[in-house]
Amino acid sequence: MTLILGIDPGSRITGYGVVRQTARGCEYVASGCIRTGSGELHERLQIVFRGVSEIIAQHGPVTMGIERVFMARNADSALKLGQARGAAIVAAAEAGLEIAEYSATQVKQAVAGTGGANKEQVMMMVMHLLKLTQKPQIDASDALAIALCHAHTRSSLVPHGLTTARRRGGRLRL
Protein backbone atom coordinates (compact mmCIF):
# COMPACT_ATOMS: atom_id res chain seq x y z
CA MET A 1 0.00 0.00 0.00
CA THR A 2 1.43 3.36 -1.09
CA LEU A 3 -0.02 6.81 -0.54
CA ILE A 4 0.42 9.08 -3.56
CA LEU A 5 -0.03 12.85 -3.70
CA GLY A 6 -1.03 14.52 -6.95
CA ILE A 7 -0.58 18.28 -7.38
CA ASP A 8 -2.15 20.53 -10.02
CA PRO A 9 -0.17 23.72 -9.39
CA GLY A 10 -1.49 27.24 -9.73
CA SER A 11 -0.61 30.65 -8.34
CA ARG A 12 -4.21 31.27 -7.21
CA ILE A 13 -5.61 27.74 -6.85
CA THR A 14 -3.49 24.62 -6.37
CA GLY A 15 -5.41 21.36 -6.52
CA TYR A 16 -4.33 18.33 -4.52
CA GLY A 17 -5.39 14.71 -4.49
CA VAL A 18 -4.27 11.80 -2.35
CA VAL A 19 -4.85 8.20 -3.41
CA ARG A 20 -3.89 4.88 -1.85
CA GLN A 21 -2.36 2.44 -4.33
CA THR A 22 -3.06 -1.18 -3.45
CA ALA A 23 -2.67 -4.47 -5.27
CA ARG A 24 -6.26 -4.04 -6.49
CA GLY A 25 -5.88 -0.49 -7.78
CA CYS A 26 -6.29 2.96 -6.31
CA GLU A 27 -8.60 4.21 -3.59
CA TYR A 28 -9.61 7.78 -2.86
CA VAL A 29 -8.16 9.29 0.33
CA ALA A 30 -8.58 13.08 0.08
CA SER A 31 -8.70 16.00 -2.32
CA GLY A 32 -9.26 19.72 -2.33
CA CYS A 33 -7.81 23.08 -3.24
CA ILE A 34 -5.29 25.40 -1.70
CA ARG A 35 -6.65 28.90 -2.37
CA THR A 36 -4.10 31.68 -2.14
CA GLY A 37 -6.29 34.74 -2.57
CA SER A 38 -5.04 37.85 -4.27
CA GLY A 39 -2.05 38.89 -2.15
CA GLU A 40 1.47 39.53 -3.34
CA LEU A 41 3.07 36.68 -5.29
CA HIS A 42 5.57 35.82 -2.55
CA GLU A 43 2.69 35.54 -0.05
CA ARG A 44 0.74 33.26 -2.39
CA LEU A 45 3.80 31.05 -2.93
CA GLN A 46 4.23 30.77 0.83
CA ILE A 47 0.58 29.66 1.12
CA VAL A 48 1.17 26.98 -1.54
CA PHE A 49 4.32 25.77 0.24
CA ARG A 50 2.62 25.64 3.64
CA GLY A 51 -0.54 24.08 2.24
CA VAL A 52 1.33 21.26 0.50
CA SER A 53 3.46 20.75 3.63
CA GLU A 54 0.30 20.43 5.76
CA ILE A 55 -1.26 17.92 3.36
CA ILE A 56 1.92 15.83 3.44
CA ALA A 57 2.01 15.95 7.26
CA GLN A 58 -1.68 15.05 7.52
CA HIS A 59 -1.81 12.17 5.02
CA GLY A 60 1.78 10.89 4.87
CA PRO A 61 2.26 10.23 1.15
CA VAL A 62 5.62 8.79 0.12
CA THR A 63 5.62 10.02 -3.46
CA MET A 64 4.21 12.92 -5.46
CA GLY A 65 3.24 13.47 -9.07
CA ILE A 66 3.02 17.04 -10.34
CA GLU A 67 2.02 18.52 -13.67
CA ARG A 68 4.74 20.08 -15.81
CA VAL A 69 4.49 23.71 -16.83
CA PHE A 70 3.18 24.26 -20.33
CA MET A 71 3.97 27.41 -22.28
CA ALA A 72 0.81 29.47 -22.30
CA ARG A 73 0.14 32.46 -24.52
CA ASN A 74 0.89 34.68 -21.54
CA ALA A 75 4.53 34.31 -20.46
CA ASP A 76 3.84 36.03 -17.12
CA SER A 77 1.19 33.42 -16.27
CA ALA A 78 3.58 30.60 -17.18
CA LEU A 79 6.26 32.08 -14.92
CA LYS A 80 3.85 32.38 -11.98
CA LEU A 81 2.66 28.82 -12.58
CA GLY A 82 6.27 27.63 -12.57
CA GLN A 83 6.91 29.42 -9.29
CA ALA A 84 3.84 27.85 -7.64
CA ARG A 85 5.00 24.50 -8.96
CA GLY A 86 8.43 25.14 -7.43
CA ALA A 87 6.87 25.91 -4.03
CA ALA A 88 5.01 22.58 -4.10
CA ILE A 89 8.12 20.68 -5.22
CA VAL A 90 10.23 22.18 -2.42
CA ALA A 91 7.56 21.23 0.15
CA ALA A 92 7.62 17.63 -1.12
CA ALA A 93 11.42 17.51 -1.30
CA GLU A 94 11.68 18.85 2.27
CA ALA A 95 9.44 15.97 3.39
CA GLY A 96 11.58 13.42 1.53
CA LEU A 97 8.98 12.43 -1.07
CA GLU A 98 9.91 10.94 -4.42
CA ILE A 99 8.79 13.40 -7.10
CA ALA A 100 7.74 12.73 -10.69
CA GLU A 101 6.61 15.17 -13.36
CA TYR A 102 3.98 14.56 -16.02
CA SER A 103 2.72 16.57 -18.97
CA ALA A 104 -1.00 17.24 -19.27
CA THR A 105 -1.07 14.89 -22.27
CA GLN A 106 0.52 12.06 -20.26
CA VAL A 107 -2.05 12.51 -17.48
CA LYS A 108 -4.98 12.52 -19.91
CA GLN A 109 -3.61 9.45 -21.71
CA ALA A 110 -3.17 7.51 -18.46
CA VAL A 111 -6.60 8.36 -17.05
CA ALA A 112 -8.90 8.79 -20.05
CA GLY A 113 -7.07 6.74 -22.67
CA THR A 114 -6.45 9.70 -24.97
CA GLY A 115 -4.14 12.67 -24.68
CA GLY A 116 -6.83 14.85 -26.23
CA ALA A 117 -9.42 14.32 -23.48
CA ASN A 118 -11.15 17.43 -22.14
CA LYS A 119 -11.46 18.31 -18.45
CA GLU A 120 -14.97 16.86 -18.18
CA GLN A 121 -13.87 13.51 -19.66
CA VAL A 122 -10.92 13.38 -17.27
CA MET A 123 -13.20 14.18 -14.33
CA MET A 124 -15.67 11.46 -15.28
CA MET A 125 -12.86 8.89 -15.50
CA VAL A 126 -11.44 10.04 -12.14
CA MET A 127 -14.90 9.59 -10.61
CA HIS A 128 -15.24 6.14 -12.18
CA LEU A 129 -11.76 4.90 -11.26
CA LEU A 130 -11.99 6.13 -7.66
CA LYS A 131 -15.70 5.29 -7.28
CA LEU A 132 -16.61 8.86 -6.32
CA THR A 133 -20.29 9.71 -5.97
CA GLN A 134 -19.84 13.50 -6.13
CA LYS A 135 -17.89 15.62 -8.58
CA PRO A 136 -14.69 16.99 -7.08
CA GLN A 137 -13.66 20.59 -7.72
CA ILE A 138 -12.00 20.86 -11.15
CA ASP A 139 -8.51 21.57 -9.77
CA ALA A 140 -8.88 18.71 -7.27
CA SER A 141 -10.06 16.43 -10.09
CA ASP A 142 -6.96 17.31 -12.12
CA ALA A 143 -4.76 16.60 -9.08
CA LEU A 144 -6.44 13.21 -8.56
CA ALA A 145 -5.83 12.46 -12.25
CA ILE A 146 -2.14 13.29 -11.76
CA ALA A 147 -2.01 10.96 -8.73
CA LEU A 148 -3.66 8.18 -10.79
CA CYS A 149 -1.20 8.76 -13.65
CA HIS A 150 1.68 8.52 -11.17
CA ALA A 151 0.24 5.31 -9.69
CA HIS A 152 -0.11 3.82 -13.17
CA THR A 153 3.45 4.80 -14.09
CA ARG A 154 4.84 3.41 -10.82
CA SER A 155 3.00 0.11 -11.21
CA SER A 156 4.22 -0.32 -14.78
CA LEU A 157 7.85 0.15 -13.61
CA VAL A 158 7.75 -2.06 -10.50
CA PRO A 159 7.33 -5.41 -12.33
CA HIS A 160 10.56 -4.68 -14.17
CA GLY A 161 12.41 -4.16 -10.89
CA LEU A 162 12.47 -0.38 -11.22
CA THR A 163 11.22 1.84 -8.44
CA THR A 164 11.89 5.27 -9.86
CA ALA A 165 12.54 6.41 -13.40
CA ARG A 166 14.54 9.54 -13.86
CA ARG A 167 13.27 10.91 -17.13
CA ARG A 168 15.98 13.54 -17.47
CA GLY A 169 19.18 12.10 -18.86
CA GLY A 170 17.59 8.69 -19.30
CA ARG A 171 19.13 7.31 -16.12
CA LEU A 172 17.30 4.90 -13.87
CA ARG A 173 17.68 4.67 -10.12
CA LEU A 174 17.23 1.15 -8.75
UniProtKB/Swiss-Prot annotation:
Tell me, what is one Gene Ontology molecular-function annotation carried by this entry? crossover junction DNA endonuclease activity
Q: Where is the active site?
A: 8, 67, 139
Please tell me whether the keyword Transmembrane is annotated for this protein: no
Record's catalysed reaction(s): Endonucleolytic cleavage at a junction such as a reciprocal single-stranded crossover between two homologous DNA duplexes (Holliday junction)
Residues involved in Mg(2+) 2 binding: 67
Which source organism does the UniProt entry give? Pseudomonas putida (strain ATCC 47054 / DSM 6125 / CFBP 8728 / NCIMB 11950 / KT2440)
| Cofactor info, note text | Binds 2 Mg(2+) ion per subunit.
Q: What is this protein called?
A: Crossover junction endodeoxyribonuclease RuvC
Subunit-level organization: Homodimer which binds Holliday junction (HJ) DNA. The HJ becomes 2-fold symmetrical on binding to RuvC with unstacked arms; it has a different conformation from HJ DNA in complex with RuvA. In the full resolvosome a probable DNA-RuvA(4)-RuvB(12)-RuvC(2) complex forms which resolves the HJ.
Q: Where does Mg(2+) 1 bind?
A: 8, 139
One annotated Gene Ontology cellular component of this protein? Holliday junction resolvase complex
Gene3D superfamilies from the entry?
A: Ribonuclease H-like superfamily/Ribonuclease H
Q: Does the keyword Magnesium apply?
A: yes
Q: Which UniProt keywords apply?
A: Cytoplasm, DNA damage, DNA recombination, DNA repair, DNA-binding, Endonuclease, Hydrolase, Magnesium, Metal-binding, Nuclease
What is the uppermost EC class here? hydrolase
InterPro entries membership? RNaseH-like_sf (IPR012337), RNaseH_sf (IPR036397), X-over_junc_endoDNase_Mg_BS (IPR020563), X-over_junc_endoDNase_RuvC (IPR002176)
Primary location group: cytoplasm
